[in-house]
Amino acid sequence: MFGPGRYVPDPTEGITKVEDLPAPQLRFYSRDCKQTPGPRCGHGAPRHTGGQRTLHDLGDLYTDRPVHLVVAFSSHYCDTCQRHFNIDLSDLAPPGGHYTNRVIDLAVRVVVEDGLPYRPASWHLWRDHRVFVPFATIQNWVEAGGKKGAGPYPRHVLGVGT
């Protein structure tokens, strides 16, 4: 029986291949709308088709496994604008990204506020939050928010579908 202050080793310590990490827990989320306003005109655009996107989210510490957020989304066609567009998911993740905004914010905060180098920050995210982020990805996120980039990624993208 473990008591307070006893060392309990991380069962994943020493694993060198991503394939050997625990299998992720899948959580399903739907953004499938039958109709939504067009990006330019605001008229109702019916659902044209649908899709699915998998995002890496912060892990579940109770089960000690990573979490993959499987997002079902709808694609629409506006007859007035004559444009195809997907439902806006920028509140969950940046366009084209594989990680949720929560993971990106936490990774940047660990490096900037806590002063951790990129490699230890990657291990910290896995050990404490059960999300695997390569250290080079963290470096890209941090540098994109600094003076080299044009600022952090946009939270709300204007002109989606243009």
Name each model feature, range by range.
Residues 1-83, 87-90:
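Short, conserved DNA-binding cores of transcription-related domains
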Residues 59-161:
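Short, positively charged, Gly/Tyr-enriched micro-motifs
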